[in-house]
Every structure is written in structure tokens, then in C-alpha cells.
Amino acid sequence: MTFTKAAPGAAFVTAIRAMLLRDMGGCISPVHAFIFLQGLETLSLRVERHVENALKVVQYLNNHPQVERVHHPSVSSDPEQQALYQKYFPNGGGSIFTFEIKGGKETAKKFCDNLELFSLLANVADVKSLVIHPASTTHAQLSEEELNEQGIYSNTIRLSIGTENIDDIIEDLEGGFQSV
């Protein structure tokens, strides 16, 4: 970019601003920095709760008759993956994972729509539990073949487990299963 052509009257200032934003990013205000630091102080506690809840949900889903398969490192049948999981995640894996519900696309969508505690959102790692049907939302632009290549099927559901009471989370999931 030529700044003398883009902003002839303020080329130097524009160049400095553009380079600073590109190289260093935007600067947050003091208030936002304070809020960020406040959240950082409790991050380890929140992650601990996320992981603890996720492991319980994974076990619940892994034993549920309406679930085809759970994709989480804690339930892998591959001995090599289990060894890596134990080595790198001694306190448990992440709180974001997918599972396949028995049935097709409509079953998966109905399950998601009937959850009450879970929010139907595309973002992840929130304090609240989130659910989404990737094939009809975040990956809707892909063909069925492309989805399958990425391990996303019409019955795949992605969960991001939050910090709510685990009994409430499992009760909500059970309500979703009862609706299908």
C-alpha cells in the first residue's frame, strides 16, 4: 500500500497507525485491561470446572443408548491416543467435543432445539454450555462429501460444556434425548 496515494494529506500518520495496528493489534482501554485481569485470576478454576463437567458428560453420553459415538480423547479405544491423552492431559481433556446421535439430520436438529440449559450458539469455551449442529450451521456451505471427510456427519452434534451444575447439564441432555 502506498500511503501517499491512499492518504496524501496524512500519509505519515496513516502509515504509523496502520503498521502499529498490524504489528501490535488494537490497544485496550485501562478499564478493559482491568476487567481482563479480573477474569484471568479465576481462569484456572473455570477451566478446572469445564473439564470436570465435560468428563462426566462424556461418560454419560458414552453409555447412552441413543448415542452412536462420542469424539473425546478420554474415550478413545486407540492405545496410542490413550497414552498421549494421559501424558498431555493428566487432569482431563478439553470441554469441547462432538458426538453422533442415533438418527439423521432432523433428529440431531430436534435434539439441539429441545435443550433448555444449553444455548444454541456457534462460539465455544463460554461459561455457559453451548450446543450446535455443525452440518446445518458452521459447516453448511460444505457438501456432504466434504463434511464426511472432516468427520462431520448429518447426526453430529458439538457440545461446549460450561460451568453449570453437572446435574442440571445432564438433566437437560436427558430432556433432549426424550424429545427425539
Question: Which role does the model predict for each range below?
Answer:
Residues 113, 129-180:
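PLP-dependent enzyme catalytic core of the Aspartate aminotransferase-like
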